[in-house]
Design a protein with these regions (language model features):
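Structured loop/turn residues at beta-strand edges in well-structured enzyme cores
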Residues: 1, 42, 104
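Surface-exposed, flexible loop/turn segments at secondary-structure boundaries
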Residues: 11, 36-38, 86, 117
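FMN-binding flavodoxin-like domain, especially the glycine-rich phosphate-binding loop
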Residues: 24-27, 55-163
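A short, aliphatic-rich alpha-helical micro-motif
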Residues: 41-42, 73
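N-terminal beta1-alpha1 ligand-phosphate binding loop
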Residues: 2-25
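A short beta-strand-loop structural module common to alpha/beta enzyme folds
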Residues: 27-38, 84
């Protein structure tokens, strides 16, 4: 089965996660929405969409892609991942940003965690990350959730090879 991994990334975390998926899934293609917008998604059997979360909102390029391709996506095998620093809110982020129809039909949707690196931020985002960092519990870790990523990969592989 042909798999499309389509994503948007602000600081590289979502791209890193998309690359992990691409390396672990056979016959997969990875596309960054900041570079390509007009891929024929109909030729893929599984479509995986990844996005960062900023202040509870998905990337505008992902939102536009989903809106433009909604009728195709609702009839395809899909999976979604988000990268965010506040993993305890991940279900809320999905409920606020994705339709119930898409989530109900998804193979899996999950959070892959995040990275709060101030050096990768720019402008207002840099200021916000500094403020959030100061107000956070010092023991709180913001990191990629390898267990979630591996579980996600296994769920996709089961659909690719059901026997």
């Amino acid at each position: 089965m042909k798999t499309l991994i389509i994503y948007a990334s602000k600081t590289g975390t979502t791209e890193k996660c998309a690359s992990i998926l691409n390396k672990n899934l056979k016959d997969s293609t990875m596309i960054n929405l900041s570079r390509i917008q007009n891929e024929d998604i109909d030729k893929y059997d599984i479509i995986i969409i990844g996005t960062p979360i900023r202040m509870g909102i998905i990337d505008k390029r992902v939102k536009k892609f989903i809106s433009k391709n909604y009728n195709i996506l609702k009839n395809k095998k899909t999976a979604y991942f988000i990268c965010c620093g506040f993993n305890e809110n991940w279900k809320q982020y999905y409920d606020q940003n994705f339709s119930k129809e898409l989530l109900d039909n998804a193979i899996i949707y999950d959070t892959f965690g995040g990275d709060l690196n101030i050096d990768k931020q720019k402008g207002l985002n840099k200021f916000i990350v500094k403020m959030v960092s100061k107000s956070m519990d010092k023991n709180r870790k913001i990191e990629l959730l390898n267990k979630n990523i591996n579980n996600f990969i296994e769920n996709i592989k089961e659909v690719n090879n059901p026997y």
